[in-house]
Structures are given as structure tokens and as C-alpha cells.
Design a protein with these regions (language model features):
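Short beta-strand segments enriched in hydrophobic/aromatic residues
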Residues: 29, 82-84, 110-111
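Short, cysteine-centered beta-strand-loop-beta hairpins and adjacent loop/turn segments enriched
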Residues: 57-58, 84-90
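Low-complexity, intrinsically disordered terminal/linker segments enriched in charged
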Residues: 109-125
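Hydrophobic pocket/interface hotspot
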Residues: 9, 24-25, 33, 48, ...
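A solvent-exposed, acidic/Ser-Thr-rich amphipathic alpha-helical stretch
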Residues: 22-73
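Short coil/turn motifs at secondary-structure junctions
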Residues: 85-87, 100-102, 112-114
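Hydrophobic/aromatic beta-strand elements that line small-molecule binding cavities or substrate pockets
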Residues: 52, 64-70, 81-83, 92-98
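Short acidic-aromatic low-complexity motifs
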Residues: 2-31
Length: 125
């Protein structure tokens, strides 16, 4: 089941990342889908898809480099780096997806500008 859950997330994101097709993402989300992000309100399926559509214009051309996709039971975790060619900072993103009955039921997203990582981890060294 773990690899099946990973495949669900990868197929859901493929159309969005490769072509910007938000409508291709919708069938992979449960009707009760909830999106969580620190410092932001929780979004329903309809609200989140609308936010993704609105973000596509300013984020057109965004490059996404997926570094890790890990699965544990009904959760899939993806670490990626994203950037806009010739604009804005590169960001590191961790997405956590919870799968329920073959659909994405919940998502969490942590975003950090890569340039801030060194400053934020100064205590680590």
C-alpha cells in the first residue's frame, strides 16, 4: 500500500508540475480534503484549488526539483527545491500528504527560502 500511496501523489502532481493543469489535480483530492500551512488558514479542497490556480500566473515557469519522496503508511513526504528562472529566491519545500481510501485527504506544506537556511541553522554548527 505504501508504494501505491506514493504513486497517487506522484500522479496527482505530475500534471500540475509539468503543465500547470490544476484540473488534473482535482480528481486525486478527497471531497473532504484539507490543506494546512503554518501561518496561514486551513483551506478546503475548493479553496486550495482556487489558490493554486491564482498562483499559477505569478509562478509560471517555476522549476521544481524533487529530491526525496518517502512513504510511511498512509503518509507521503516530498522534499523539493523550487525557483523561478531569473527571479526570486530559491525555496526548499517539504510537503506531507495523507492518503485515505486512494485519495489525498490532507496536505501540509513547509516553505523556507534556501538563502535563510544557513542563518536559521546557525545554532546547529
Amino acid at each position: 500500500m505504501t508504494m501505491e500511496n506514493q504513486s497517487i501523489v506522484q500522479r496527482a502532481l505530475a500534471g500540475l508540475i509539468e503543465t500547470g493543469d490544476v484540473d488534473a489535480l482535482a480528481p486525486f483530492l478527497s471531497d473532504d480534503f484539507v490543506h494546512h500551512r503554518p501561518g496561514a488558514t486551513t483551506s478546503t479542497k475548493v479553496e486550495w484549488l482556487a489558490a493554486v490556480r491564482a498562483a499559477l500566473v505569478p509562478l509560471a515557469g517555476m522549476q521544481v526539483e524533487i529530491h526525496q519522496v518517502l512513504t510511511d503508511g498512509d503518509h507521503v513526504v516530498m522534499y523539493s527545491r523550487r525557483w523561478l528562472p531569473d527571479a526570486g529566491p530559491e525555496i526548499a519545500v517539504v510537503d506531507i500528504w495523507r492518503i485515505d481510501d486512494g485519495l489525498i485527504a490532507e496536505a501540509w506544506e513547509i516553505i523556507e527560502p534556501v538563502a535563510q537556511v544557513t542563518a536559521n541553522l546557525a545554532w546547529w554548527v
